[in-house]
Each structure stands twice: as structure tokens, then as C-alpha cells.
Amino acid sequence: MFINEIGWPGWLAMMLLIVAALLMVVHVSRWITNKRVSLNRSRQLKALATSMVFLWTAGLLAYMFALASGSGTFHSFELLFRSALCSLGMFAFQVDGDVFANITGGNDAPLIRGIISVITVLASLLTVLLFVSLVAHRLWAYLHLVFSTIRATIFPRRRLFVFFGINDASKVLAEDIRKTQKENDYSIIFVETPLTEDEGEQGSGIDSIMSILTHRAETFRTAAYNNALLSIASSRLSDLSTSDIEADNNVLRSIGVGLLARIVRNMHKTKNAEAHYFILSDSDTDNLNKAGVLRLDSTIMSAAERGVKTTLYCHARYNSAHRVIEDEACGENIDVRIIDSSRICVEHLKQDVSLQPVNFVDVEQDGTVSSPFNALVIGFGEVGLDAVRFLYEFSAFAATGSTSEKVERSPFHCDVVDNRMDILAGKFYTNTPALRSLPVAPRGELTQEKADNSIVLHNFDARSAEFSKLLLDKIKTLNYVVVATADDTLNITLAVRIMRLAIRYSQRPQMLRILVRVHDRSDGNIDIVADHYNRLFKAQNDKETLREERPDGPITLFGDFASIHTYENIVSDRLVREARRYLDKYNNRYPSEWKEDWDARHRRLLGNAKDSHLSPSMSDIMELRRKESQDIANAKHAATKLLLAQKAFEKSGKDGKAKLQELRSAITNGAITREFGKTSYTFNTPNSSSNAQPSTFSSLPSILASLAWTEHLRWCASHEVLGYVYGDKKDEARMTHDNLVSWQELTEEVQSYDCNVVDVSLEEIE
């Protein structure tokens, strides 16, 4: 037999052939035994690769037979390597003619030629299949988009969600849209850009060609998973700038997504059509540039003018520089929204009633607060800065002992730690001149605290000895901790360390909450750590705690990608929706000449109420931002006021929830009334439609007064974190306000505005 004549190379080839055959059998058996496993892209490539290895080894062995049967003689290694090269050539549609022609061996020669021919045909076929599999996804995506474009022309969908680029943010948001939208009246389209130079677009040879043809496998998987269309642009949107855009310039067509432009062009045929465009990359600069370019696209502008509600979502920090694109779009048919993930993180804290500062102080029978609120913020980046602002505003309570002649804020103290504080503090000082803060200490020194300081900034690392000293000094009375560094592992490590110290040294460890910023919770590892230590904390006082419990302990995780990028937060914009509803209820307590809804205010300050050729002033912009931020804060702070009233009732030994419900019913049904412009309430005999009883009214004057004081203190704190200071008159451009004074210095009419906010907060939701 020829294999004995070949020697060890033949036996090696035979072993490789057997291994390849076994691999094929394993793959086929898996598919047969589990029919539910789909033949996805990965499995297709594995099947092709296994088959190609099998054919290559078969060709290797066949060529060994062919060479050994010829007239020449070969060294063993020469025979092995030449056969291997000849076998590889079969996948490139090549047959070694010299070897093929010189095959001898009598009756075996036709058989060897036939085997080589069959293997060559099969190998060539696999090469074609491999090429097709690599480009099939892109071809199918294009055909799918073409068919959808034709369908959209005839039967356009009401809502369109377009994502420019595929990253973690766009994938999470698209998935949430798919899961939460019950009506099948929308389409999701991913516009993916060409591969960058680093990813091989500018490479040479076969690598460059294959990169262009195959694109990213993850791109196609993401589109398929979300039942989305995929349009791959021929050029990058970031290569354009607003200065390049001329009148009637079709940006979508210029970057090679003309089919998307056709879909947008036909959307006006559907009633209440909406088009949402998302630019959510990690680069603020690129996002702002892309949003500016898209806003000038002739197709998008035309659709907006024809009644399609058009919104551009741009991921960037919500600051004065980046808000320019929102201001420029005001008055146009296209709405531009800045999506600040750090801001949304902290808004989540406000949304969760259990995390509001009112839960970590002592509330007395009159609704005042008798204990200090002591906080620690680790990391003074975007999230840390917003957390400081949140705590300063939402921990503004009327101190026990306050009277209408002298209302004071309950003690508040916040230590902020960051190893780059010498750089970060400047912005904080500049933007919030009203906040009393100490100068930043040199690196390595502990800032000396003074009694009249509310916020103290420390310039050292959270792993330093200085931080340990600070923590040991503060842990006894610490109420609230926010850990918001850029390192998730460091964040949870610090949280566990603080919790362990609180168990050892805190006077009231049950009054401590540790908020931990976690960017990615997909693997669940940090959740396991948090649940473990929360369970240990609960079991310390509750011996019946079960091992599988996930108790609500001191450590709370927040700010992960999936919880931020949701339909509710981004598209539905829950913050603005709740603020609008709150403003409507607030306006109902004013005479008709005072009423101005959300949209009317926009039109008055920035929109159609102005001459289209005139620019809004700085005062217009600042007034709009200030009032809208107050509407949002009022909506969120309502929970604090309700909890203050409930805790006040509970302090007097009553059923807090029941008494709070009686109070809300009395306010809603007119059992408790107040004249416009006045602060005193009239307690009427409860009517038949109210559940309130006369005994409920006995302690209410002091509670309602405390709530109004608290609202004024919150209002002052919110304006201070916005950057406002006291002035003889209100000047939006100079950021001065004449109401930034103590409660007792206000006129009764101005005080009644705070009472209005309290009344709206107490009203039952219809």
C-alpha cells in the first residue's frame, strides 16, 4: 500500500484526517441532538473551518499518494511540505498539473486523479461559501433595507429611531425600545460608519478588502437581535462640519445612506409621525458636530416642516458650551436634546424616594429636622459634582426651633474628596459663588474644618492616609456617602470599607446610606458583593435573615449603563414630562393672568413669539433654564415634603400614612383652603367627600408652615447651586435674585409662592 511506501508523513496525514473527521462528526451530532440551536454566523464559520481542515488533510494525503506514485523520489520533509502546499492550492481553484500528469501506479492512478479532482471541487466550493458567508450579512442588510424602504413608501411607520453608530449606549437603548414598545408602529435603523484606519480600513491587500466586505460581525448581530434595519454609510458623518453644509444639502445622501433619506421623506404621510435621531458616542465633540450637521440636512428639515416631530439626541455634558446647540435650535421645527448620562445618574437618586436625604435625618412633630445631615462624596467628576448639588439642595430642612420670625436651615456638612481637587475646584468655586467652601488644601494635607462651612473640598486620594484620618473622624455621624470614581472595583471596595467602619464606630449605622456608582453591572459580580455585605449587615440584627435574601442594606448601586439609557429617560424624557404636569397643577392655583404653560414659556422666551430675525437675550436663556430646572426640582422634591409630613405625624404617635392621606384628601377636596397671596390656611369642617377628621387639623398649622419653610430653603439652595447670588433686584443675566434671603425677610405674597408649591405637592394625583 502506498502509505507504507510514504512512511511517517503518510501516517501523520492520516492522523490529521481522522481528527478532522471527528471534529466534523462532533459538530453535526450537536446540531442533530439540539435542533433549537440556530446555525448562526459563528456556527457557520466553525462548520466551514472544520470542513476546510478536513478537505485540506484529505488533499494532503491524496497528493502524498500522487507524488509517491510518480517517477521522482522525495525526501520525507519535502514530500510533506510540497503536498501541504498543493493541498492549499486547491482552495484557490488550483491543481498542480505536473503532479497530476505524472501520477502512475497502474489501476490506482485514475482513482488518485479522481480523488484529487473531487477534493479540488469541494475545496473551491468551500472557498466560495466562505466568501459568501462573509459578505452575506451585509448583502442581506442592504436587501432588507431596500424592501423596508419600498414598504415605508407605501405604508410608512409612525415612529422612526435612527442610531448613528453602534456602541454600548445605542445597543442598550435600542434593546429597551424594542422591549418596552407594545405597538408595532416603529422602525429601528442603525447607521454604521466605515471602519476607521485603526480597524483596518486603510490596510493593504486582502485584509483591507475583507474588512470592507465583512464589516463588524457584532454590527449585524446587534441589528438582528433588535429586529432593526442596518445601513452602512460610505463615509463618516464626523468628516463633515457645519461650515461644509450648503443650502439644500442632503447630508444623508452625501454619506451614502440614501435609502434612509427616502424613508424619512415619506414619514409625513403618517399621522403624528415622529423621527428620533441618536448620536451617542463617547466623544462629546464628535457628537455635537454630528448633531449640528444633521440639523442642517435638507431631508430631515423638510420632514420636520411637513409635520414630522423631529428630535436629535446628542450625548454630551450638559454645560454652557454644549447647550449652545439646544439654544440655536430653539424656535425651529427640530428639537435638539443634550443627553448627559452623569446628570441622569443623579436624577435617578432623586427619583428613588428611599434614597432622598429626608430618610436619614430626625423629623420632629412640627415637621422640622433636629439632626444634622453629614455627607461624604468620593470623586469630584461629573457624577460627584452633580451629587454634591443634589445633596445640598435636597437636605435643606427647617431646623428644629425655627419660627416664622427666624427660620434656619438644619445643619449640613459635606466633605468632598478627589486626588485632582486642585484642578476640579476652580470650576466649582466659579460656578457657585454663594456656596461657602474652604480653599483647597495642598496635596497631602487635611483641610481644617470650620463650623460655618457647609462644603469642604479635600485634595487627596481615597486610598491615602489622609482619607483614612478623615473617614475615622467623620464615620460616627456620617449619614450619606456617594462613591463616584471612574473605577468600579475601587468604588465597591471603598463602600465595603466604609460600611465595616460604620458597624464598628457609627453611633447610628442604620441611618447610613452608601451610594456606589457602577458603570457596568452586566456580569453581576459587583451585585454579588453588594448583596453579600447588605445581607451580613441585616443579619447582624436579624437572626432570621436567609442566605438567598437580597436585602435593602446600606450599599446601593446606581448609574449603570442599562438603567441610564432607557426609553423613559431618553426619549420619553420622564423628567420633563413630570415637570410639565407639576407646572400645570401649579398654574391652577394662580389667577388666569399668571398662567403660562411649558410651551408658552418657550415661545415667549425663545420661540415663535419673538420675531424670527431677533435673537433671544442672555436673560431669556437664563430665565428659561432657571424656571425649567425649578419645575423639575419641584416635581422631584414633592416626595420629600410628603415624607416630612408623614414622619411628623409618626413622631406624634399617629399612623403616618393614614394621616398623610387625610391631609392630602383635605387639600384636594377643599377642607383646607388658602387665599391667593396669603400664607395662612383655613380649616373648614370636613365635607362628605373628604375623609379628613377635625382631629387631623390640630397639628397641621405648624407642619404646613415647616413645609413652606423647607420649600424656601430648598429654593434658595437650588439657586445657589445654579450660581445665583443675592441682589437688590432680580437680574437673570447677572444671576442675582432679590428673594435669596431668609424666610422672614420675604413679603407675605412671595411666601405664598412657597405655600403654593406645598399645596401642589400635597394634592392627590388625578
Question: Predicted regions span which residues?
Answer:
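Cytosolic regulatory regions of ion transport systems
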Residues: M1-G59, S69-L80, G89, G97-P686, ...
